[in-house]
């Protein structure tokens, strides 16, 4: 696999904290010196990472116009997690909270969902290999470092993985507009996986049928649905609220 670009202070700092050996080189805006950037640059230099100063136009071109905050790094790709890693992840959590994204192919939405997952303490985000956005620099930037901290598990057969986790005691709750009860009427404690579908299409049929329960977010206005990353945040933090109340 070829090296990857990550950009933005949050994303670079997250890799520094978790896996600094991945760094190949870094590019920084010429003349930029500020309190947020300097500690990151100092740590990169301490690690012996080559740092090149570049003009804003050169950085913009390298980041393909995305907001890079004056810092881009070239890193070795992280090891891609798969279904075989789930047992180890579950073993680290007494009552894991998981997030399943079925068909989220927009990198901005995936990045925002990863950021939500990190904030909510999600043990892992599970996606199908064939129906998910790849982990690009855009995803890492939108995720503000969460793409480097939240385990992203790509599985070959999502329904089969769900059934295997059900046998280990994980309860799967899917989100669907036609559900008969909403998230505030549902128990979201214990070993739980919240399943979100793609915007518009929702969950695929087999994913929906494999869920233990279906819930919806109550909508009071004229809009029929929320952006998937917004809906993801609403559901995850209702689960967090219930879990905190049960302590």
Curated annotation (Swiss-Prot):
Recorded catalytic activity of this chain's protein: guanosine(2251) in 23S rRNA + S-adenosyl-L-methionine = 2'-O-methylguanosine(2251) in 23S rRNA + S-adenosyl-L-homocysteine + H(+)
Primary location class: cytoplasm
Chain positions recorded as S-adenosyl-L-methionine binding sites: 197, 217, 226
Keywords in alphabetical order: Cytoplasm, Methyltransferase, rRNA processing, S-adenosyl-L-methionine, Transferase
Organism lineage: Bacteria, Pseudomonadati, Pseudomonadota, Gammaproteobacteria, Vibrionales
Domain of life: Bacteria
PANTHER family xref list: 23S RRNA (GUANOSINE-2'-O-)-METHYLTRANSFERASE RLMB (PTHR46429:SF1)
Protein name, as recorded: 23S rRNA (guanosine-2'-O-)-methyltransferase RlmB
Gene: rlmB
NCBIfam families hit by this protein: PRK11181.1, rRNA_methyl_3
